[in-house]
Amino acid sequence: STGLLRLRHATATLSWPKTAVTFGQTWYPTFVPEVFPGVVNFNTGIMFNPFGWAGQVKVTQKLTPELSLSLIAYKDREFQTANAIGASANSATFNSSMPTLHSQLQYKSKSITAGLGAEYQSMQPVIESAGLASDEKVNSEMFFGYFKYANEKLIAKLYGITGGNLHHLVMIGGFAGYENPNGIESYKSTKTSAFWVDLSSAHSKIAPGIFFGYTKNSGTEAGFKNLYMRGVSGSRI
């Protein structure tokens, strides 16, 4: 057997009175540490809630004592999009010079945490297709929102997300491949939507709770030749 050291989180932050700059590897911006499923299982609501971490640079600006705006650029590493024909592990990230761009507005008070965010990702699955040079990209947008209310008796959380090619967030979906007349494969993302609700007691010793999650794969345009995604029929998903 072989033992390996696995780096999950390693960051540094430069702080000023109203501005902070963080760089390193930490949670995806869509995984909100204050608002994630409080299930007993270690999977933290995977498939309904984003999961994973990536190398990133984040700039956070305080607009008021409770309201902040974060701008983030990150690159997938350990968690990645699906591999197209001719691709190797994480080649879609390596081939793309543009990082994933993310913006998030968050309100945080003593009892309420709420936020809205958006993300744009442009990946290049391969640099060669059908023996020809390829610069075809799979472009996608994503939008999400969340809310948490907590007092001395109750904790209530809600989260919703919708967008294309959410495979790297350990959710269903990915992208489809389309054959062009010249043989080069082009790509379009598949759309995934998910939401969840988590209600639990705030008791310090025994805290019963209930979690409900729903996710839907809305597919993509017709005429595709190949599917590169999680959540389709097969021996492995």
PLM features: what roles do these ranges have?
Residues 1-79, 97-98, 102-113, 149-159:
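Outer membrane beta-barrel
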Residues 2, 76-91, 95-96, 212-234:
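C-terminal/domain-terminus segments
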Residues 40-41, 76-90, 122-132:
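Active-site-proximal beta-alpha loop/turn segments in soluble metabolic enzymes
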